[in-house]
C-alpha cells in the first residue's frame, strides 16, 4: 500500500523518536538540524567514514547516536548550493520518501547551511515526497506480510524551516498540483474495462465540485455538429463516445481563454488495422493526453488560477467490429474537410481534428495546445525522455520549452513544413490520415495543423512520456501524469492576469 503523509511546518522541532532527515549542500561542514539530533557531533565522523560529501541525492543512513532525540538519521545531499533549483527540491523530497518506506514519523530539517531556502522549496520537497510515494494498487486484494505499518495510516512529517508562513501558503498550491498529477496517473493506470468513454466523462464531471463548468456531448450531439472523423473511430465499439468540455473561469470576464485539447482513446486495438498482441495491454493508456488535460483543469481550479481556461477531451474506443471503419473509407470532419482513412490505427488524429476545430469555432481561444499519445515514431526519435513539440507559433513554442525546463517535463521542438504537408495529400479526399512510416510524427502533426486555422497552436506528442517512461525520484508509476505540471507552469508564468 502506498505511503500517505500528513505534513506540518515548524520553525523549530525536537523529534521524539522516528526518523530525522538532515539536508546538506556539497562541501558544507554540517547539515541542517545537526545540533538538534547530533549533540555529540558523531555525524561528521560518520560522513567522513561513509564518504558522504553532500552530492546531489546521495544519502547516508545511520542509527541515531546516543543522546539523539531521533531513532534514525538520514543525511541527504543537495549538491552545489548555487545549482539547487525548484526541481531539485522535488527530487530531494522523492529521494527522502524512497529511503524512508518503513518510517512511522519523520522530521525534515530543511534549512541547509550555505543555502537560502524559500517557502516554495519547502512545499516542493513535500510534494516530491508525495509524488514518489504514489502507487496504484486499487485492484490488489493480497497484501504482503511485511508491509510496513506506516502504510496503514498517514505518516506524520514535520518540516523544520524558517519560512513557515510562506511554506504553508506554497504547500496549498503544491497540493493542488499533486492532486492533478495523481488524477492523471489514476486515469492512465485504470483498466479499460472499468474506464470507458462514459466513465471517463463521469470522472471529469466531478471537477464541478471545484467550480469547473463541465459539459458532456453525446453521440447524437456530435452527429449534429458533423464530427464524422471522431465518430468514425468510435463506430466499431459498443461503448458510445463522448466529448467533454471543461471551463474554468478564473480570469477577467472578456479575456480570451487558453485551450487544452486531449486525445482520449480509452483503449486502442488499432481497429481493423489491428495491433500485434504483444504489448497491446498498454493501449489502455492511449488516453494519456485526455488524462493530462483533466488533471490540469483540476490544478487550475483547485489553486484558483487567475485565467480563463478550456479543457476539451475526445473520448472513444477503437475496436474491430462488423461496423468498424475500414482502410479506404472516407469521412467528413466537422471542418468540412474530407479524410481518407488509410490506417485505422492512425485514429488519434481523427479524434483531435474534430476536437480542435470545435474548440476554435466555439471559443475563439488565444491559443490551443493539444496533448496526445499520438505516434510510435516520436518514441523512435526521442525515446522516453522528451515529448515532441510541434507549433505554428514561435512565441508559444519558446514558452513551452521554458516550462519544460522549469518542470523537467522536457520537450524537443520538431519541424513542420510544406514538404511534410504534401505527404498527407490524398488521391480521393482532401487528405489522408497517414503519410507512411517516414517522418510519422511530423506528418501526424501536419494533419492536425489543418484544423487550427491561424490560431497559435502547439501539439505535444507524449507517446513516450505519458506511460512506461523510466522511473525516477518523483515517479514510480507506469502512468506518469506527464503534462500536468508542464502546462500549469506555462499558465502560471505567462497567462494569469
From Swiss-Prot:
The keyword Protease applies. Presumably involved in the processing and regular turnover of intracellular proteins. Catalyzes the removal of unsubstituted N-terminal amino acids from various peptides. The gene is pepA. It catalyses: Release of an N-terminal amino acid, Xaa-|-Yaa-, in which Xaa is preferably Leu, but may be other amino acids including Pro although not Arg or Lys, and Yaa may be Pro. Amino acid amides and methyl esters are also readily hydrolyzed, but rates on arylamides are exceedingly low; Release of an N-terminal amino acid, preferentially leucine, but not glutamic or aspartic acids. It is found in: Cytoplasm. GO terms for molecular function: manganese ion binding; metalloaminopeptidase activity. This is Probable cytosol aminopeptidase. Belongs to the peptidase M17 family. It comes from Rhizobium meliloti (strain 1021) (Ensifer meliloti). Mn(2+) 2 binds at residues 263, 268, 286, 347. Keywords: Aminopeptidase, Cytoplasm, Hydrolase, Manganese, Metal-binding, Protease. InterPro entries: Leucine_aapep/pepB, Macro_dom-like, Peptidase_M17_C, Peptidase_M17_leu_NH2_pept, Peptidase_M17_N. Its cofactor is Mn(2+). Pfam families: Peptidase_M17, Peptidase_M17_N. GO terms for cellular component: cytoplasm. The active site is at residues 275, 349. GO terms for biological process: proteolysis. It is an enzyme of class 3 (hydrolase).
